[in-house]
Every structure is written in C-alpha cells, then in structure tokens.
Amino acid sequence: MAARRALIVLAHSEKTSFNYAMKEAAVEALKKRGWEVLESDLYAMNFNPIISRNDITGELKDSKNFQYPSESSLAYKEGRLSPDIVAEHKKLEAADLVIFQFPLQWFGVPAILKGWFERVLVAGFAYTYAAMYDNGPFQNKKTLLSITTGGSGSMYSLQGVHGDMNVILWPIQSGILRFCGFQVLEPQLVYSIGHTPPDARMQILEGWKKRLETVWEETPLYFAPSSLFDLNFQAGFLMKKEVQEEQKKNKFGLSVGHHLGKSIPADNQIKARK
C-alpha cells in the first residue's frame, strides 16, 4: 500500500515563529509514521495572493468584461492556468490530508492564504454547483486548520469579548473547505501563544505530534448533509420542507450556519460528534 501524502500550507513569514515550529513538528511526526509530506510555505515561495488576468495564459473569452470565476474555470479545463497555480493543484491532487498552519488575523486567515484559496480553488477543479459540499471534488481528502491566536481562549468563548470561536471558524471550515468536499477535522487551536512560556510551548508541540500519529482515524466535524437540501436553482438550494418540519422539534440547530433560528450546538466547529 502506497504511503499517504500530506500537504502542509504555511502562512507565516518568520522561521523563528511558533507557526513555523508547528509546521516542523507536523513534518517530523507525519514522516515518522510513514507519510510523504509536501509543503507550500507561502511566504518563502513569495506566493502571489492577487487574482488577475495574469493567472490565465492564452486568449481570454471576454477581455472587455473580464470575469475571473468563469475565465479561470475555462483556463483550468483547457490547461491555461499560470504555472504557480498548476503546481499547487498537483500538490492538492496528490494529498490525502491538508493542514493549514497560520496565525488568526482579523478573525480570519492571513491575506496570503486568502489569496491562495482564491487563486488555487478555482471552479471546475475545487467545486461546481453540481459537485459541492458532500459531493465536492475533495470528498475523499481530510483537512484541518492549525491556528495560533494572540488572545486567550477565554476571549473567544461564549462570554468572551471576541465572541464564539465556532462562529469565527465557520466561514473557513464550511464556506471554503467543506464547500470543496473536504472532510474537516477538529482544528488545532493554540491560544495566546505570545504569552506562553517555553516549557508550555514544548508541551503544545509534543501534543501536536502525538495527535498526528492517529490523525487519519479521527472523526470529522459535523456539517448538515447535502441530502437535506433541494440542490437546484428552481428550489433555491433550500432545506427540504420535510426536513424543516422535522427539525422544529429539536432544541438546537444543525450547525453554526444552519442554526434555523435556534441555539447553536456547542462547539460545532471545534469538536466532532462522538
């Protein structure tokens, strides 16, 4: 049986950072378990995060009214995307597991990683309206976010000043990763790293390596299955009426995004259902 492959996408500029240490720990742990590890160190690569006409070679379909989604999708089908995008596609295609390592910035991913998502996850390659969520192209791949924060865990709690971390994670984990079909594993959250002493940092790194020993066996986070929705333009991609009726008797919504006007299930974007 061929070794599994992991892709680690790092979005931090400094090799002295804890994010870099987390990346190195992941490489070490996975290789020790027989994984082949690919890397995309976005700052070291000087990765261009800006979508533009330069992402496409050859003649545009409509140069006067350039529309990136349709032009990049066509370029993907015809093999006319820029070499740096194609290189990332090859890594993604080869990977069984994708780890995104980054510091939380303004309640989201760093700009360079946002640009990676926008340029690399083009229509046709990463999704179509006929192939999204459960049916997405990456449905047999697993992914997880490994995030550091400046603030403490309590700041991202239900009563914390920043609000619920589950809500912050939803646009990334559902709106990007699950949308493309990924099975999304529990995020690796490292809070307040700037105020964490060296011995505690070492414990975090060791715990991360320990987790990665069995990461492939982990249960993914729960997202509302596509089968609950009428997935067509005529129906508006809405939740089926019988499902809505069935859900009325439940105290909690299905997920952070599909809360149905009710309380959100606790830690829906942080802990997998047991």
UniProtKB/Swiss-Prot annotation:
Protein name, per record: NAD(P)H dehydrogenase [quinone] 1
Subcellular location: Cytoplasm, Cytosol
Annotated gene: Nqo1
A single Gene Ontology CC term: cytosol
Family that this chain belongs to: Belongs to the NAD(P)H dehydrogenase (quinone) family.
Domain of life: Eukaryota
Cofactor(s) annotated in UniProt: FAD
Induction info: By polycyclic hydrocarbons such as dioxin (Governed by the aromatic hydrocarbon-responsive (AH) locus).
Reaction it catalyzes: a quinone + NADH + H(+) = a quinol + NAD(+); a quinone + NADPH + H(+) = a quinol + NADP(+); ubiquinone-10 + NADH + H(+) = ubiquinol-10 + NAD(+); menadione + NADH + H(+) = menadiol + NAD(+)
List of residues that carry N-acetylalanine: 2
Modified residues (Phosphoserine): 82
Physiological role: Flavin-containing quinone reductase that catalyzes two-electron reduction of quinones to hydroquinones using either NADH or NADPH as electron donors. In a ping-pong kinetic mechanism, the electrons are sequentially transferred from NAD(P)H to flavin cofactor and then from reduced flavin to the quinone, bypassing the formation of semiquinone and reactive oxygen species. Regulates cellular redox state primarily through quinone detoxification. Reduces components of plasma membrane redox system such as coenzyme Q and vitamin quinones, producing antioxidant hydroquinone forms.
InterPro entries documented for this protein: Flavodoxin_fold, Flavoprotein-like_sf, NAD(P)H_dehydrogenase_qn
GO MF terms, alphabetically ordered: identical protein binding; NAD(P)H dehydrogenase (quinone) activity; NADH:ubiquinone reductase (non-electrogenic) activity; NADPH dehydrogenase (quinone) activity
Key words of the record: Acetylation, Cytoplasm, FAD, Flavoprotein, Isopeptide bond, NAD, NADP, Oxidoreductase, Phosphoprotein, Ubl conjugation
Binding site for FAD: 12, 18-19, 67, 104-107, 148-151, 156, 201
